[in-house]
Curated annotation (Swiss-Prot):
It comes from Saccharomyces cerevisiae (strain ATCC 204508 / S288c). It is found in: Nucleus. PANTHER family: 80 KDA MCM3-ASSOCIATED PROTEIN, LEUKOCYTE RECEPTOR CLUSTER MEMBER 8. Residues 276-450 form the PCI domain. The gene is THP3. Signal peptide: none annotated. This is Protein THP3.
Amino acid sequence: MQNPYGHFTNNTTEDREASSQGGPFGQSLNRPLDYAGSFPSLTYNNNNFIANQQPSLPLPEPRLSWNNVNQVSNPLMVTPLPGLQKRMNKNIKKKLPRVSKKASALSNGVSGNVMSNSNIVGHGAVGSASGWKVEMGGSDELERRKRRAERFSQGPSATTNSNDNLNEDFANLNAISSKSHQYDKKIHVVGRCQTLEKSYLRLTSEPNPDLIRPPNILQKMYCLLMDKYQSKTATYTYLCDQFKSMRQDLRVQMIENSFTIKVYQTHARIALENGDLGEFNQCQNRIMALFENPTIPKKSYSEFICYSVLYSMLTEDYPSISHLKLKLIDDGSSEILEDEHVKMIFELSDMKLVGNYHYFMKNYLKLHKFEKCLINSFLNLEKLIFLTIICKSYNQVNLDFVKSEFNFNSIEETTNFLNEQNLTEFILNKQITDSNGKSSNIKILNTKGCRVQLIQNYMKSKKIDIKGQK
């Protein structure tokens, strides 16, 4: 009988007769095999099987891999052809792990004889079926590895860069260090320099007392600078450099008194007068921090409260204005909010926020000198927004109306403002007749035709350059 397991033959005549009658179990061997126990004693390749025993196939041999090539092959395994054997050997070599310099260094540094990880092969390692054996070098090699391990086990040296400079307060003008080198900023330094004038240089190391001026020299320098400022014999660049140098010396020596705040306030006003909003903002932040010191008298406190509100209006930081108002109430300084001028400044910020430009422009005339210097930095943009609102509300307006709303002194000044906005072609002459029959010529602005131009001008002027402050 032919079946999937090979050629099976009956051993005896009785067995053949029994099989012709259906066998001892009533089944014919000519039928397909239902289960292994149906067979009597059978022969498979001259090997006898006991009856009712399941004939089993030879177990499959393990896959040919790089670590069992030298093992004895099963006699039942078919020997591959010579050409196929060469290709198999080539594939086996490809599967072997590659040796890298890093892996070699790792394996050479291992204190042991056997590594079971086949992905790391050491320099001079010997392959085996169980793993890879590392051959250690001589005494020179061991000494070299020891020095290498010590070098990598050491912490970062003092000369390497670190992340300490992340702790620097770069919002402060007098940041002590611009590099990773740090020192204790709480060490009290007493200056010994007797030179009045000194240019500002950012500190990159510990301050040298021989290059720092003591308070008495700084007071003399302050009087010298004020004389030059009032006589207008010095440029703003020179004044700014000298004031920054004075502020640095005060900061390094940790001097916080009435003279310190006077230096910062004077520099802030001069910076406003010259349109230097960057230096003003640095001085203003330091002034507000000094006012929190209870030993310092709050002279001109309300003045710099107004400056802080106007600067927040410039940057459109209205939450800071609300926070400042709440802080004054919590600190028991609510009497400052009762001051008429301070109250007007806070109302001015509210009107700008809601877009009440009529009130905004009328109260602009009530501002003080340095307050106007601060608000002038963004006044042209507010005028442009106000003019856009007017043009969306009317089809045409008289230039006298524009003159009164924008606080211009004459029609010529109004016309110059419109010409700066590229609206010259929209200024028209119109003849009107009054109730007495008298005719006169007036200038009007065709607001309906200039709306698109105004919107384009607004988009171009939306960004304000205040030296990196916005």
